[in-house]
């Protein structure tokens, strides 16, 4: 509660005490040019006590596009495999979420061009520990993670969550929720 001047503020509740357990960090929109000349954007999260003289591990997470979510708030919570930036920045990671612009018929090359060029762009910063860069994707992003580790050794580890690792067998697979085969979607 406050008066009309907003000088004196009195807190009357503490609805989310768990928030004190997080270092909320900052997020910024970063831009770069891909290897193939595409102008790209992505989100870059840093710890709230970010020190440019320190080296930070980098977590690269992706799924199509996220830059439109620059001002969205995601409540930290346990999840099957989605990277919540707040969890990582609270543990002194930098989190990079690049957008992917797909060229029809070339998903692998599109993902490589956008994700790896974005990683290179971020890795130019002296505060990135290039020996501790990781990659994570879920579902379609998991498929791309499994594919990317065959195309570059830039990442020291990778986690492919719920990936399709065999497109032929996945074509006849049953979709979660709908019960329909993928071939009918």
Annotated model-derived regions:
Residues 68-70, 168:
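Glycine/Thr-rich phosphate-binding loops of Rossmann-like dinucleotide-binding domains
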Residues 54-56, 131-132:
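Short coil/turn segments at beta-strand junctions that form active-site/ligand-binding loops
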Residues 1-54, 78, 83, 90:
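Non-catalytic accessory segments flanking enzyme active sites
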Residues 1, 70-72, 104:
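A flexible loop/linker signature enriched in serine peptidases of the S9 family
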Residues 56, 63-68:
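Active-site glycine-rich loops that stabilize anionic/oxyanionic intermediates
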Residues 14, 18, 50, 68, ...:
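Conserved helix-loop functional segments at active or binding sites
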Residues 61, 75-185:
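Active-site-proximal cap/loop segments of hydrolase catalytic domains
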Residues 48-49, 65-66, 164:
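Flexible, active-site-proximal loop/turn residues at the rims of small-molecule/cofactor binding pockets
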């Amino acid at each position: 509660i406050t008066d009309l001047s907003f000088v004196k503020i009195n807190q009357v509740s503490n609805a989310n005490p768990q928030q004190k357990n997080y270092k909320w960090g900052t997020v910024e929109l970063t831009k770069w040019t891909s290897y193939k000349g595409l102008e790209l954007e992505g989100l870059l999260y840093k710890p709230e006590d970010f020190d440019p003289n320190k080296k930070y591990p980098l977590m690269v997470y992706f799924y199509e596009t996220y830059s439109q979510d620059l001002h969205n708030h995601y409540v930290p919570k346990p999840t099957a495999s989605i990277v919540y930036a707040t969890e990582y920045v609270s543990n002194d990671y930098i989190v990079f979420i690049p957008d992917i612009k797909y060229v029809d018929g070339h998903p692998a090359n599109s993902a490589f061009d956008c994700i790896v060029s974005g990683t290179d762009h971020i890795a130019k910063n002296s505060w990135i520990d290039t020996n501790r860069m990781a990659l994570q994707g879920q579902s379609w992003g998991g498929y791309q993670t499994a594919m990317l580790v065959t195309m570059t050794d830039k990442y020291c580890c990778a986690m492919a969550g719920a990936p399709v690792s065999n497109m032929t067998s996945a074509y006849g697979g049953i979709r979660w929720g709908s019960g329909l085969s993928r071939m009918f979607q």
